[in-house]
């Protein structure tokens, strides 16, 4: 009888099962929008073929006495129509199922993954192989599988944290900071704690020009826009609390690795509302300096080691899993009190040239207890994927309206509404709106600027990233 292969969870994944709950399913979605309607049969064949190159993705999650672990299975993913809530829970205790799903709607292919398996970079590599297989089968492009496989590297299953960990190189006591009480966004939450998605698409060239005009990177400007939108929602009493944005960092940019498992860290950008002078120019320097300080090579190395140190802590090792779960859950709740929201820059997505004629754009979303923005670009399409448990999101409305005020056209689509919204420079509340067909995901339409409430110029409504802008569009 063949012996089943099992994998330890990487250091970023160890806390994931213990911190899953409510709208924070710890599931993320990566979407590829094709230029033609999806062929379900070709997609199923592509997923089956691609899964063979990522054997640890066919694992199921099990509980050990001291840690969770991945147990390789013979299960195969079944491609289905997109007919369930976005970012819905994947892992349920006691259920024997894969930790990812693939579904489709119209021209869109969605890959949803439980964060235990991988981060955004690993998931995009998997999706690229799926797309290569799909194009090979659907359009007869026989060489695509080989091209993408070579780009993915040879050590997809390795734990990069273990490879680069240096004993004793953890954060010193003087460098550790206690979590602060951050400002929290308010709003009506979905009664079923489901995530609401909003996708905003802008021109890479337009957004990059706006960033350069302000001497900022794409990541810095995006973060500053999020902070400014949150500032507008704060009352006078709220301003005693800082805005704290959590920003994932792709550690592969600092430690070479082709791993398809989790390999990311997190930095926090803290902004004191008292510093705000009514302009982005009073926010961007604070964001820039925060990135500069925390993304120095030595600081990133300390951050990476702090993640890996958990596995090497003897006292933690011998604590039973049941107790670990309780402790980790309590610590996570405390840490969440110190976070306003999250913004993650996945960066520029590229595919082999032969595939480009068949792909329109990519987007990504991450389940969130409050609000998370993920951005990625493909060619001249820069997409901001917003996931939130809030039914209405004035902060996100202002986030996109500020882009419009900067002269950037924004096209919005949501899983909550039957239309998208194109927001052009100069749109004003109270004007008329012209709606015309243009259905994409969810049968959305394209709406011209100027609509009043109920059809507003901006509709009220989710990995590892690259905040430094090394792979920015």
Language-model regions: role of each:
Residues 54-64, 139, 143-164, 210-225, ...:
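Short, charge-rich amphipathic segments
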Residues 35-51, 112-128, 197-236, 343, ...:
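Acyl activation and transfer enzymes in specialized metabolism, enriched
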Residues 1-67, 74-101, 231-423, 465, ...:
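Acyl-thioester-dependent acyl-group transfer interface
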Residues 196-198, 202-206, 244, 265-267, ...:
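Non-catalytic regulatory/linker segments of enzymes
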